[in-house]
Amino acid sequence: MSKNVFTVKKLVFCAMAIALATVICAAIKLPSLPNGGSVTLFSMLIICLAGYWYGPVPGLICAVAFGILQFIVGPYFVHPLQVLLDYPLAFGALGLSGFFSNKKHGLLLGYIAGVLGRFIFHEISGFIFYTEYVGNVEGNLLAILASTVYNLSYLLPEMIITLILLALPPVEKAMARVKSMAQA
């Protein structure tokens, strides 16, 4: 007999995380960049919480679902491969947080892993985007640099703000309480 990955409670918690993160992405964008990407108020954290609460499989499924929803709500791509890289894979990487769910400082480590994974997929996508404009070796190096600067300009500020918030003792305690409630 196989164990269900999702109970009704897990589905509800994951659906609420997806809904809340989607509303935050749509309603509260600090700087919004012209080619996609923006600093949001903790939307990546909210998706990473699903992995932190329930482990890698529910975390990855929830994060991929969020990525698909982000594509439906506001797609931006130049090359068809970017659809896969920028949405289900990049946002899906936030579910990597689930691999740290039972570790000390699991939320912090999982969040960093998720954002790093998201960065890697956006970096590959950005390289594809920028190489549409340049075609030689020097151009490829410039494409990598341009993609790195562009992606870090919104991912890094949000990550730093979130890590500062998560390092606060009251927030750390609150997150532990929410995790026990989600798992009860």
Which residues fall in each region the model found?
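Short glycine- and Lys/Arg-enriched binding-loop motifs that mark or flank ligand-binding interfaces
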Residues: 47, 51, 63, 106
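Alpha-helical transmembrane segments of multi-pass membrane proteins
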Residues: 44-48, 86-94, 159, 163
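Interfacial aromatic-anchored transmembrane helix boundaries in multi-pass membrane proteins
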Residues: 23-39, 64-99, 130-135
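Hydrophobic transmembrane alpha-helices
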Residues: 1-52, 57-58, 93-101, 166-170
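Short helix-perturbing small/polar motifs within transmembrane alpha-helices
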Residues: 1-4, 10-23, 62, 82-127
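Membrane-embedded alpha-helical hairpins and interfacial helices in multi-pass inner-membrane proteins
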Residues: 32-37, 75-84, 103-184
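Transmembrane-helix signature of polytopic, membrane-embedded enzymes
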Residues: 57-65
